[in-house]
């Protein structure tokens, strides 16, 4: 499992020109699921994202997590994160979890995130989404759970 997380001052997801998820200050997290991923690894990833200290403390040091700053978490499923790119000039998506299985695990991941944090929004699994983000920093990190 991989996550590309971005510290944002605001972010939103639109599907068919309708906003389906949005947050103010917080983390925009693109989630890539692989065939070996489980509910346990999904929970571990959510815990890591929520605890990752990418917000400034009073001294300007990255020392606070999204919960400590009362920020939002916007989760967006992103199978392309699992692409193999080491050969050729075309991505190979064989490393991604099959869509039906990924949809179910992503739903479970969202449910767990909402149990852990009260400001959780999502995109729409499998939809063509327009994601807008006001990156803060910018600060971007790739997190991996195996």
Curated annotation (Swiss-Prot):
Catalytic activity, as annotated: glycyl-tRNA(Ala) + H2O = tRNA(Ala) + glycine + H(+); a D-aminoacyl-tRNA + H2O = a tRNA + a D-alpha-amino acid + H(+)
Compartment(s) of residence: Cytoplasm
Claim: Zinc is one of the keywords in the record: no
This protein's GO CC annotations: cytoplasm
Top-rank lineage group of the source organism: Bacteria
Record's keyword annotation contains S-adenosyl-L-methionine: no
GO biological process, one term: D-amino acid catabolic process
EC number: 3.1.1.96
Primary location group: cytoplasm
Keywords assigned by UniProt, alphabetized: Cytoplasm, Hydrolase, RNA-binding, tRNA-binding
Motif (Gly-cisPro motif, important for rejection of L-amino acids): 137-138
InterPro entries xrefs: Daa-tRNA_deacyls_DTD (IPR003732), DTD-like_sf (IPR023509)
GO terms, molecular function: D-tyrosyl-tRNA(Tyr) deacylase activity; Gly-tRNA(Ala) deacylase activity; Ser(Gly)-tRNA(Ala) hydrolase activity; tRNA binding
Domain remark from Swiss-Prot or TrEMBL: A Gly-cisPro motif from one monomer fits into the active site of the other monomer to allow specific chiral rejection of L-amino acids.
Record note on quaternary structure: Homodimer.
HAMAP family: Deacylase_Dtd
Role noted for this protein: An aminoacyl-tRNA editing enzyme that deacylates mischarged D-aminoacyl-tRNAs. Also deacylates mischarged glycyl-tRNA(Ala), protecting cells against glycine mischarging by AlaRS. Acts via tRNA-based rather than protein-based catalysis; rejects L-amino acids rather than detecting D-amino acids in the active site. By recycling D-aminoacyl-tRNA to D-amino acids and free tRNA molecules, this enzyme counteracts the toxicity associated with the formation of D-aminoacyl-tRNA entities in vivo and helps enforce protein L-homochirality.
Protein family membership: Belongs to the DTD family.
Protein name: D-aminoacyl-tRNA deacylase
């Amino acid at each position: 499992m991989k996550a590309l997380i971005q510290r944002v001052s605001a972010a939103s997801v639109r599907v068919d020109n309708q906003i389906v998820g949005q947050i103010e200050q917080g983390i925009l997290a693109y989630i890539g699921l692989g065939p070996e991923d489980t509910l346990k690894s999904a929970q571990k990833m959510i815990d890591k994202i929520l605890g990752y200290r990418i917000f400034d403390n009073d001294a300007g040091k990255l020392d606070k997590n999204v919960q400590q700053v009362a920020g939002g978490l916007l989760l967006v499923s992103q199978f392309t994160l699992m692409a193999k790119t080491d050969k050729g000039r075309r991505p190979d998506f064989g490393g991604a979890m099959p869509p039906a299985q990924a949809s179910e695990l992503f739903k479970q991941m969202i449910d767990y995130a909402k149990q852990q944090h009260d400001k959780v929004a999502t995109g729409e699994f499998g939809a063509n989404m327009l994601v807008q983000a006001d990156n803060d920093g910018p600060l971007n990190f790739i997190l991996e759970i195996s």
